[in-house]
Amino acid sequence: MALQPVTRRSVPEEVFEQIATDVLTGEMPPGEALPSERRLAELLGVSRPAVREALKRLSAAGLVEVRQGDVTTVRDFRRHAGLDLLPRLLFRNGELDISVVRSILEARLRNFPKVAELAAERNEPELAELLQDSLRALDTEEDPIVWQRHTLDFWDHVVDSAGSIVDRLMYNAFRAAYEPTLAALTTTMTAAAKRPSDYRKLADAICSGDPTGAKKAAQDLLELANTSLMAVLVSQASRQ
């Protein structure tokens, strides 16, 4: 029996989770009015301050709109939420949502080659040593999950070297969403994505100051990884 640590949530967090889940699954569609604060407290068996705190969090996450003295309504999270919502969207009822994985991988393919190009243009001397450390880890690591974390570290260095705060913040959101999926994708990654030579080719292009070569190497690496990953995920889903 695989036991997991027990997580003790606060009451406001429990309220937040219940309402957020209903919003994200469509159980509560955009525009629907929530019960009053008093009624929510009665239905959930909690205090009004706990409900109030949960509603503040839901509002900050772009899931509801709270109007003082008026009803609280569900917002369309696709229009109002931020990238920090991605980790919640990846898993629905404990299952990996393939459509969200596909969106993340497509966004990675569109953005990361440009980041590699920028890093090669800047060609910061300290980047070479950092990437070599990552490459050594990729060459020797046996554990597939840890290996994938090393690839994320590799891209961490590339993103920092590109010098774009927007790309940096987008990468933070990507990593926060992607990293929790590593255990679920271990089998796929072992077979399809463990290609340290592709990362070495990319590192060589960046460190030699070759923007065109770096962009192409990143494009090739990510296209292959995306194609292999999605093929296995779709195959697994069809068997369920």
Swiss-Prot record:
It comes from the Bacteria. Gene3D superfamilies: GntR ligand-binding domain-like, Winged helix-like DNA-binding domain superfamily/Winged helix DNA-binding domain. Transmembrane segments: none annotated. The keyword Ribonucleoprotein does not apply. The keyword Repressor applies. Residues 37-56 bind DNA. Keywords: DNA-binding, Repressor, Transcription, Transcription regulation. One of its GO terms (molecular function) is DNA binding. Residues 9-77 form the HTH gntR-type domain. Induction: Expressed in mid-log phase cells and in gamma-interferon stimulated, mouse macrophage-like cell line J774. SMART domains: FCD (SM00895), HTH_GNTR (SM00345). Negatively regulates the expression of its operon as well as expression of end (endonuclease 4). Was identified as a high-confidence drug target. This is HTH-type transcriptional regulator Mce2R. It comes from Mycobacterium tuberculosis (strain ATCC 25618 / H37Rv). The gene is mce2R.
